[in-house]
Structure formats: C-alpha cells, structure tokens
C-alpha cells in the first residue's frame, strides 16, 4: 500500500489512500472516496481536487474520508504521488479552513 495510490475496492468503488506509509502494518487505510464528477454537483476546488484516472475525471471527496479495511482493497490502479500538494491542501482546507 502506498500513500496517494488509487485503489479499486471489491465493491467497485475507487478510493485515494491518504495514510502515511509508515503505518502500513495497520489493518485499515485512511482514504478518500473518488467519485465521478457528475456525482459531486458543487465541488469546492480546493476541498475537492479533480484527478484524471484511467481517462476519467474523478473528484476526491475529502469531507467523506475515513478508514477502510485493507481486506476490502481489490487492486491498485494509479498513483498521484506527484499531486501530493493538492491532496494535502484539500485536507488543510477540511481541517483548518485554509
């Protein structure tokens, strides 16, 4: 598991892993759901970064982030390690308002 990797869950949903790699031994991962743009009617740019995954635009729904069981992860499909600032800024917005 790697921070800022996108995983497809067994349910078919996509999530962005946001947990520090140092905590890889835990049975859960802190992640944010990645929804289709059409499912997020009024995204807030800084809170909801837009990511292109396998040719499709997805919105990181930061305000719905939470823990998922590692056993629910089916496959890794992308990495956004190069977009770490936009992702970290989304959590800053959620937690501090800035």
Q: What are the functions of these language-model segments?
A:
Residues 1, 5, 14-17, 34, ...:
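A near-ubiquitous, low-amplitude feature marking generic local secondary-structure context
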Residues 3-12, 16-47:
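Compact nucleic-acid interaction/catalytic patches
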Residues 48-52:
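Short conserved beta-strand and strand-loop elements enriched in small hydrophobics
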Residues 53-98:
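C-terminal terminal-subdomain/extension
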